[in-house]
Amino acid sequence: MTFLPRSRAIRIGFRPAVAAFVASLLVCAFAWAAPAASGDELQLAIILTRHGVRSPLKTNEAMARLASQPWPSWEVAPGIQTPRGNALIALMGDYYRARFAEAGALTGDPAVDGPRVFIRADNDQRTIETGRILGKSLVRLGEPDVHSLAAGTADPLFRPVRAHVGHPDVARAVAAVLGRIGGDPRRLDRAYAAQLAELKGILFGPGGAPLGASPFDEPTTVRPGDQESLVTISGPIYFAEQCTESFVLEYADGMPASDVGWGRVDERALTDLLALHELFFDLAQRTYYPAQVGGSNLASHIIDTLEQAALGQPVPGAVGPSGERVVVLVGHDTNIANVGGLFGMNWMIPGTQANPLVPGGALVFELWKRGGEQNSFYVR
């Protein structure tokens, strides 16, 4: 089955209707911003979500050199969504169902709502499982169809660099990141010295110093990326992102406090350390040119899907058939960072840093029809 008729970067010359949507998206906030006016009707909701809580992508053996104590064990293999991750995603689905039923996009009747929901996921276990659980919670009608490409296929919607969508300029991407930090990545090590020192104290215990050579002794560098990303950031900032991501996953999975950062990471410390995590993604994924390359194809299909709902007829490039009321796109933290950077979106969640990329977090695009006006829509 073909889900996307074409893959491409955002066009320079938009059709008038699409240009209006883009202007709305650039001005509007994400998720639920200002309340809709009385009498307005929700025509379509597009949920761009990260998968749920998973185990770290790297094995404990691969992470061993980053700490003086063994990392906690997980009940699932690396990169697999956990049972608690499944349960938390189900709660998100319950929330979306209640909200969209109240707004009129869903009815609460599974037989009616089933055909109104379309789910498109990347082909990892964690993304497919998130789509499946969200679909069950949204509709409550058996097992939903989760549309994805064959396993092992680089999906141009979620992994455009690996799928070779377009011809990105790697040197330009590196220059764009370096331009934000004065051309010297070592400035990051100095600017975030306090957070790095706190992290090393957690990783290596009192004194924050390993017995031998530490990867944190290497300076941060910025260079051309690999098949997944245009830009590679290595050194302390990269290792800090890996470690803080592990702490977030341990905490979100409900591990005992003694296992979250070996008992040395409480909520305050986790909030502080997230500054290092979000710094990495802000530079590598939200810098405008990398965000444009990584997010423009996905954003273009989102815009086509909004246009299809407004016109009430099929539009090439739209995700799902005409008539859907909820479209779920299940991807990764990089997808949310790319689209957020492309559209200039910023968000805050209590207990985190700016623009957090939490498991199960989402950007939600809503198309509303103005009450009492013919063919008048807005996006928020």
Locations of regions flagged by a protein language model:
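N-terminal secretory signal peptides that target proteins for export/translocation
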Residues: 1-14
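Intrinsically disordered, low-complexity segments enriched in Ser/Pro/Gly/Ala and basic residues
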Residues: 4-6, 23, 37, 213
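Intrinsically disordered, low-complexity Ser/Thr- and Pro-rich stretches
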Residues: 5-7, 19, 153-154
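Signature for phosphate-centric chemistry
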Residues: 37-116, 122-327, 331-380
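Intrinsically disordered, low-complexity regions enriched in Ser/Pro/Gly/Gln/His and often acidic
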Residues: 8, 25, 64-67
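Signal peptide processing junction and immediate N-terminal pro/mature segment
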Residues: 31-36
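Bacterial N-terminal signal peptides
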Residues: 17-29
